[in-house]
Regions:
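Catalytic cores of DNA base-excision repair glycosylases
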Residues: 3-4, 9-202, 206-219, 285
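Intrinsically disordered, low-complexity, charged terminal extensions of DNA damage-control enzymes
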Residues: 1-22, 27, 190-347
């Protein structure tokens, strides 16, 4: 057996050349396009990103355009992708790039790594794919491939395992095609060396070099450290109407969903009488309350269990911003947690 060694390089490149996925950021691997795609793909499936990527590039085709964009524009383009700190860091980095690098990404791994929101994987991907630098790009897919190749039972979330994997793949980088090798490893993990006990070993171009396969462990690898249980928060979410206008609230600038617009909500699951009393105490002039279908939304560390209530007011409520349905649709980015409740406004 071979495990992670130079023997995997040529079979992977040949397999990649024979038929990798046609993705919009691969057809034109300019630095900006690679960078944006890698940020979008963090915590998000490829199929979900395709449409977002095309819309983003049409609206903000280069770094100066992103740097000059208003927050409402780039957050609206990001609406539904979640993890909004990613898009804010993209904008911060674009401003910095215009100030220090003439609106271009530097062809240097360490300088890429110093940009807001750019970690080792993203820096390695941009450096190798866009600039041809021989550095690894190790994401979750690649960590899984490495664990199976080596029959390694170290949890892939272990910092030492990640560091060793980066070092080992760095030693394999071909000087002429580092980006393609990185992409072939990502492609293998995304399409063949699948997670959750479902590897398609018979379709793998490096099956003959895989220690995990030959020892019968591919389906049980990789190991992950036990996840901490998510905290559950009960909330009462309000779809507020005053005439033809919809009431929104902006979240604090720090914390979960920082700075985003949202449907107002109250802690806990409130009964109709409790809710009416709470809103009256807040100075709201309530005409009608109507219960909506409950919903749940899962964040990384917390779950929201939400009871929805349609609230019709006689007068605008204090501390809310009222917008038209068209403005809500076109100009305000609402987190996907509220999607099922916003759909009530379209009925």
């Amino acid at each position: 057996m071979s495990g992670v060694s130079k023997a995997i390089v040529q079979p992977l490149l040949s397999w990649y050349d024979a038929g990798h996925r046609d993705l919009p950021w691969r057809s034109e691997p300019a630095p900006y396009r690679v960078w944006v795609s890698k940020i979008m793909l963090q915590q998000t499936r490829v199929e979900a990103v395709r449409g977002y990527f095309s819309r983003w590039m049409n609206a903000l085709p280069d770094i100066p355009a992103l740097a000059a964009a208003d927050e409402a524009v780039y957050t609206k383009l990001w609406e539904g992708l979640g993890y909004y700190s990613r898009v804010r860091n993209l904008h911060r980095a674009a401003v910095l790039l215009c100030e220090e690098y003439g609106g271009e990404l530097p062809a240097d791994y360490d300088r890429l790594l110093a940009l807001p929101g750019v970690g080792e994987y993203t820096a390695g991907a941009v450096a190798s794919i866009a600039f041809g630098l021989p550095v690894p790009a190790v994401d979750g897919n690649v960590l899984r491939v490495a664990a199976r190749l080596d029959n390694d039972f170290t949890p892939i979330t272990d910092a030492k395992f990640k560091k060793q994997t980066r070092e080992r793949f760095a030693a394999l980088m071909p000087s002429d095609r580092p980006g393609d090798l990185n992409q072939s490893l990502m492609e293998l993990g995304a399409t063949v060396c699948l997670p959750n006990g479902a590897p398609r070993c018979d379709d793998c171009p490096i099956q003959h070099l895989c220690e995990g396969f030959h020892r019968g462990n591919a389906a049980v690898l990789p190991l992950r450290a036990a996840k901490k249980a998510r905290r559950v928060e009960n909330r009462t979410v309000l779809v507020v109407r005053c005439g033809q206008l919809v009431g929104l609230r902006q979240r604090p600038q720090k914390g979960l969903l920082a700075g985003l617009w949202e449907l107002p909500s109250l802690d806990g699951h409130l009964s109709p009488d409790e809710l009416r009393a709470a809103l009256t105490e807040m100075g709201w002039s309530v005409r009608k309350l109507l219960s909506l279908r409950p919903a749940k939304h899962i964040f990384t560390h917390v779950e929201w269990h939400m009871n929805g209530v349609y609230v019709e007011l006689d007068a605008p409520a204090p501390a809310l911003t009222f917008v038209t349905p068209a403005e809500l649709r076109d100009a305000y980015a609402l987190p996907s947690a509220f999607r099922s409740f916003v759909s009530v406004l379209e009925d």
